Structures are given as C-alpha cells and as structure tokens.
Amino acid sequence: HTPIRRQRQMCIRDSSYINNKQLGSFSIDTSNDNKYVKNPFQKVDAVIMMDCSLCPVHKDTKNDFHKYVKKHSDTIKKNGIEPMLVMTWPYKNRPEMIHALRKEFIQATNENNILLIPIGEAFHLTNNTHPEINLYQTDNRHPSRAGTYLAAAVIFGSLFQKPTLGNTALMGLSSEETLKLQNIADLTVKNFYQN
C-alpha cells in the first residue's frame, strides 16, 4: 500500500490517483509520473485510505496524518467519491497502541465526516480473545495471512453492513480459524457502528 505519509511530497496533478484507468495497479510516489486518464466505463464509488500504524500516534507524524487525511478527503469528495479510512492495528509487541490509535482515527474521521473501517479494533479483539491466532508477520507489524483475512472481512462488513459468517473462502487457513475470524469481524463491525 501507499501510506498517506508517502504521498506528502507528491504533487497531485489532475487527481490522477482517483481517475487513472490503471486504478489499483500502481503506486503513487514522487518518481511516478501518473497521467490523468478519463475512463468513461469506470466509476469509483469509494476510496479507502490507509496509513502506517505508527504515523497517527507518533509525535513527529501525527499532525501530518491529520493534515493529509483532510487534504485527501477533500480532494476525493470534490470528485464525487466517498473517502474512507482504515483504522490500523497496534503492533503485536505494543498492544497498548490501540488506545492512541482509536483516539486519533476517530478524531480524523469525525473531523472529516468520513467512514472509519475498524480493522485495528478487530485485531485488538482477536489478540485478547484468541491469542492462538497469529495476526502478524515476524516483524510484529505487518499482517500475516490470518491478519489479512481478518482485515478483508472487516472491510467487507463495514462497506456492505453484512455478516461475513459463512463465507467459504479459506485463503489457506483452517475452517476453524476462518470461522473465528469471521465471528470477530462481524462482532467488531456490529459493535463499532452501533456506538
């Protein structure tokens, strides 16, 4: 993914990151010459933004996180598209990060009136209720296959407000593990949007 902070120095030309016909097949960075390509056959309904887990809570990057969530949300809305933001997860070896992440992500989405996708909340719940499921790569930061499955389930539930329970896709995981992850995703989405 291209975190919001990597986009800080890029020059947004013609909103090419929204309207490019190769949407989803490239990264945006300062050396990538993204051209605006109008595609009359493709309408984008939503853009999901995601930053690193440390950026919203680190003293040196927190202000930029909020600045660029606003900037990109405004640009996306101006193009008639709904911006959304993924709440990232605490590091495996720093579970207390959830409290600061929750605060900063809720503040950013409330200030910009955008949807928050609570993946971090689902990771937190899984870590507390099913510690036998490893959601992380060996670096304790990036998601494992199980973490990716959980994230996808939370995104689906958040976007469509439908349960994932019963989905037969295993993604290389055991059916027992996917059942637990689906239950956690559904519970997280239900509880998060009811509050």
Model-derived segments and spans:
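Conserved catalytic region of serine esterases and O-acyltransferases that act on ester linkages
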Residues: 142, 153-195
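Alpha-helical cap/lid subdomain in secreted, periplasmic
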Residues: 32-145, 157
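Single conserved hydrophobic/aromatic residue that forms the stacking wall/gate
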Residues: 1-14
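Charged, often glycine-rich, active-site loop that binds/positions anionic groups
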Residues: 15-32
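Generic surface-pattern signal
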Residues: 28, 110, 128, 186, ...
